[in-house]
Amino acid sequence: MSKVRIYEYAKANNVQSKQLIESLKSMGVEVSNHMSAIDEETLNKAKQAGKPAAAKGQGSTSNQKQNSQNQRSNQGQKQRPQNNQQNQGQKQRPQNNQQSQSQGQTKRPSQASNNQSGAAKSQAGKPNQNRGGNRPGGQGRPGSNNRRPGNNQNRRNHGNRGGKRRPQSKVNHQQMPLPEKITISGSHTVSELAAKLHREASELIKKLIGLGVMATINQELDKDTIELLAADYGVEVEEEVIVDELDIELYDREDKEEELKERPPVVTIMGHVDHGKTTLLDSIRNTKVTAGEAGGITQHIGAYQIEHSGKKITFLDTPGHAAFTTMRARGAQVTDITILVVAADDGVMPQTKEAISHAKAAEVPIIVAVNKIDKETASPDRVMQELTEFELVPEAWGGDTIFVNVSALTGEGIDELIEMILLVAEVEEFKANPDKLATGTVVEAQLDKGRGPVATLLVQSGTLNVGDAVVVGSTFGRVRALVNDVGRRVKTAGPSAPVEITGLNEVPQAGDRFQAFEDEKKARQLGEGLMARYREQNLTASSKVSLDDLFNQIQQGDVKDINVIIKADVQGSVEAMKGSLEKIDVAGVKVNIIHTGAGAITESDIILASASNAIVIGFNVRPDVNAKRVAEAENVDIRLHRVIYNAIDEIEQAMKGALDPEFEEKVIGQVEVRTTFKVSKVGTIAGSYVTEGKITRNSSVRLIRDGIVIYEGELNALKRYKDDAKEVQAGYECGITLDKFNDIKEGDMIEAYVMEEVKRA
């Protein structure tokens, strides 16, 4: 049976600890003090055994109280005339004045004797003991001083504090039972939790001490501690869900199944440069747009619709992968289907691999369009073979990826491609509710001189009407005009329809969500709140995953897997590093390789890393100038290595939280080799121009050719004209020789850097 401390049992059962201890000792139970732990059955027996003694004690106590009250009342009757003499400012009866003087003089010795006897010790020794007239039998008399704040009523209660106030406080606790459930949001202080549980804070502090937690009344308690305390009282804890009133998604109601209707699919075309993406788009548009529309003035708004066999398809004309990734980075899932364009004569190229990585990261179906099959050098089978390496296996070979051979120039295969798009859309069952306020995403936005802010919107659900109040990202306004993809004004736009709107107060960003409202006042209020939040967010840098704080984010539950982009000088190194990283599994956190490639780290790699919250690992390669600039702006972590085991060990140690302080490389300058001179006994002298920063005599250098590190070491000599130089600033020419290396060519880049010791966060 569970044991309970004596003082806790006494408090819960409204008995005195002293009585319980005496009863337990009389029963032969060894008890040291009130903190001793005894089983409840023994305490119940001790409580029953102690009842007669307690009753007797209460009787004697009541007799003593009665005697003391009688003595006070006698003294009050004898000494009451004295009050009239002291309260001279009040009305007095003349016949009592003389009596009060004589009686006051005659009764003082008896009063002194009563004070010494101890019948009224709390009142006798004070000079103003008789000023108050609130004693028993003395209320309502003319001489009583009821208006004085510190009268004898308070003094009497103060004297009886031990006998009256404690039982009264216990009664109050019994009147406030424990709640069945409490609601919390975040952490609470001990006093706040005590108020919710209808208990004293001191009681909670004692329980916390029992749990090994030393807490004060104002100390914050976390959720786990609150749940432990509540469970001890048998109270259920419910966590309050904090609703963000500025979240646009809250204003989009859920659709019922019977409200959903079929909508056109939204298609994005991606692929390598010069593989015919734009030509394919133009071919689809020219063959499928009706003659009447084709004859009119077509306004390019970044998206357009075609109709085939009575069904519509929406195409997004996004310029390259950057816009696609930027929109996805902003949380916009716009695309339903991705068409991967691959030239039959070129095969899989670097940007093709990037497009595959982007499409897979967005988790959308991929249809491969093998373009340029009209060329003599076309080899569609080679394209299929190369794409199997990226898990894109043709249906003819037992896979699930649709391959279509097309020619954008001749129009061959265009109809089949469109039919395949409609087939995938039918299988995926793209649906939306057209009978509600519109929601969707910004495709493009710009500031027009004549019309002001102009935004191209893709309606994803509901119907947008002219005159609707809309909130677009952190901007707001009323729709003044709707223009469709062929430049005609329309009054409404349904699901999957691209339209251009005017009437916003500012230019939104691509990828922003929009929501239509019936109440313009509500839209304005929400838009202003979002604008204020957007400005605050711009002041704080966005949080990206980096190896320095990776372990902390894992501990906090912010990171469940690590997205990694691998770039190396050769494909063999890429495969080796990929295989080693995929085997790492620390603390249940998995390494997820989202993109690999051979060659220098480019701007598109950084954009993909930013969108996917990934870390870029470079092996024997360097980022180009644009990649460095974007990485710095987007706070993308780039890790460069020359030894493959160092890269693997660094990630593994970061996941374990055991990274040591490191030396961080700081690039101080870029130098371009413009000419070379070969001198006997000296070697090759590089006639160079400092394009950025500076180069110093004691700095380390690396020679980069076409993004590949050729040499890494020290300077042998740095000269300006014929003189040795300690450093050369940007905009000046200099002569450079490298230590034990002479294979320098025109166009090479020399990167100067120093190593600075830093401590990891």
UniProtKB/Swiss-Prot annotation:
Q: Where is the composition biased (Polar residues)?
A: 106-120
Ranges where the record places region G4: 371-374
Residues of the region (Disordered) are 39-179
Asked if Thylakoid is a keyword of the record, the answer is no
Q: According to the UniProt record, where is the region G1? A: 271-278
The answer, when asked if Protein biosynthesis is one of the entry's keywords, is: yes
Report the GO terms under cellular component.
cytosol
- The record places domain tr-type G at 262-435
Alphabetized UniProt keyword annotations: Cytoplasm, GTP-binding, Initiation factor, Nucleotide-binding, Protein biosynthesis
Specify where the region named G2 lies, as residue ranges: 296-300
Q: Where is this region: G3?
A: 317-320
* InterPro entries named in the record: EF-G-like_DII (IPR053905), IF2_II (IPR044145), IF2_N (IPR006847), P-loop_NTPase (IPR027417), Small_GTP-bd (IPR005225), T_Tr_GTP-bd_dom (IPR000795), TF_IF2_bacterial-like (IPR000178), TIF_IF2 (IPR015760)
List the biased-composition ranges (Low complexity): 45-105, 142-154
Binding residue positions for GTP? 271-278, 317-321, 371-374
Q: Enumerate the residue ranges of region (G5).
A: 407-409
Q: Chief subcellular site?
A: cytoplasm
Q: Where is the composition biased (Basic residues)?
A: 155-168
- Which superkingdom? Bacteria
Which Gene3D superfamilies does the UniProt record give?
A: 1.10.10.2480, P-loop containing nucleotide triphosphate hydrolases, Translation factors, Translation initiation factor IF- 2, domain 3
Q: Which GO terms describe its molecular function?
A: GTP binding; GTPase activity; translation initiation factor activity
Where does it localize? Cytoplasm
Family, per the entry? Belongs to the TRAFAC class translation factor GTPase superfamily. Classic translation factor GTPase family. IF-2 subfamily.
- Please describe what this protein does: One of the essential components for the initiation of protein synthesis. Protects formylmethionyl-tRNA from spontaneous hydrolysis and promotes its binding to the 30S ribosomal subunits. Also involved in the hydrolysis of GTP during the formation of the 70S ribosomal complex.
Tell me the HAMAP family matching this sequence: IF_2_B (MF_00100_B)
Q: What is this protein called?
A: Translation initiation factor IF-2
Gene from which the chain derives: infB
